[in-house]
Amino acid sequence: MDRKAGEDDWEDSGAETGGSDYSRLSSTSSELSVDDTQDPFLVSIHVITDPGESRCLQEAIDRLLAWIHPDLQLFRVSERRVSKKRKPVKSFVSHPALAIILFLQEAYGEDQILHLHKCFQKPPWQFHHTERVHGKFLPYMPCNQDFFTLANGTPLWAIRQVHYGKEIIRFTIYCSYENFADMMKMYELILKKRVWRKKTDFCVFPVYSNMDFDIEFSLKRLAKGQKPVPLESSLLEFRVRDFGQLIPLLPNQCSPISEGRWKTEDHDGNKILLQQAQCLARKTTWKHQNYLSRNPAMTQPLSIAPRNRKFKSGKHKGRAGNGQVQHFGGSQMDFPRGQTDTLRSLKVPSESVQPFQRSKSLYCLPTTSDFPSCDSFPISETHLCFGQETYETPVWRSSPRINIDDLEGVEETDVDTGMKLSSSDLSVISAYSPLNGLCSDLEASLPSHGALSHSNTLPYDSLHSLSHISSSSCSVFPSATGASTLTQAHILGHYHQSSETTSHLSETLNVQEEEEEFYI
């Protein structure tokens, strides 16, 4: 694309900017949202692979996202029953239509980003291309403009640095020059979010925001003559609330593939899925809440093991000069009685461990619903901070598999072949649909009332089982890895305190509006 030499005319490519005013606005992105309820799984991606390749690709994606948060399972990989032959694409006039860019804090150390770049050099990752960007340059590490892919027909991936601000997961759709404006209006309808950052060839929609990271959805206009190539093995899925109001406004025909899911295309031919935003059944949610109210021991914070970050000296130094441990991103919490044994069983010296919570802003209480929704419960955010500097490999877990027994009688259209499928041979299943068997599985995994009356300590094995079920239901219930299970009253007080913290942070960030960096 031809660009003017003037610095003011520099256009943001969308795939290489992070931090700066984007991050400052993201802390107050809920003010710009049409729908006040935040959902970290509002946008997700389905990847369809040839037989025998799904496990390898799913693990590669999970390892990558674990550097930001292990519970962010935004990608689901499934297999088609027969391998698909693909036609070669002329690369000099085409560009893959979808990319995922991870913006990581350089304050955690360059070793982290270098490690991820080394991961891209190993299978199943494949080098795709290097992007050339014009404009204002800042010092960056090698390979900062490289894009990689997992397989043909899957999205591009890239790692970028963030000098300040929060870490970002950004979904980017590359649009044709002619359709950029129309697609911006279409996705504004689907997301029910206003564009809060826009340039002539780039715009950003806020999807989810907390104190540590943002999830964004962006559109990038290609130059004249370039054509975005829709990915034949990947589909974007969006949670929507009102099918009846949305479907007549979309540019292309919508066809149902199941009771709660529809498929359609955007102006450039990208296949997208629309899922009815459903919460767990009232019975299941209230069962969980009533269980917590009957068992106060379950409401106490429990910290299990440290996560993946290395706190460096200086900005992120773990121990202050007076010998006391500093707590980052949240308030200090003491261990409840009975958890000392849990720490000892993990072989962690209790005197060297202090729990802290990175973020409180994941607690999002519903404002209009009369019963708790999926957004009322947090992704697990409690971690342990060590006084001594240690470097830990990111803790990640593979995505839970869907129990086919819970889908008895279900019929759905295969989004890959268009054929009707029964529950016995479903090859493409939404990982975020509520499962009928969740209530019984959850109740079976929880300890009995009598067991809790004798001890306030929750066994690690039982807690791990609960965490596994939690992750399969899009983190509806707090995850076990350092999660704090709270009653509704505790959550409400926690929410008010978080709102005051976020408000104070927004006022501080507004003072810095004159600073701006473009991350290339």
Swiss-Prot record:
Transmembrane segments: none annotated. InterPro entries: FAM124 (IPR029380), FAM124_dom (IPR046365). Residues 20-32 have a biased composition (Low complexity). This is Protein FAM124A. PANTHER family: FAM124 DOMAIN-CONTAINING PROTEIN-RELATED, PROTEIN FAM124A. It comes from the Eukaryota. Belongs to the FAM124 family. Residues 1-34, 311-334 are annotated as: Disordered.
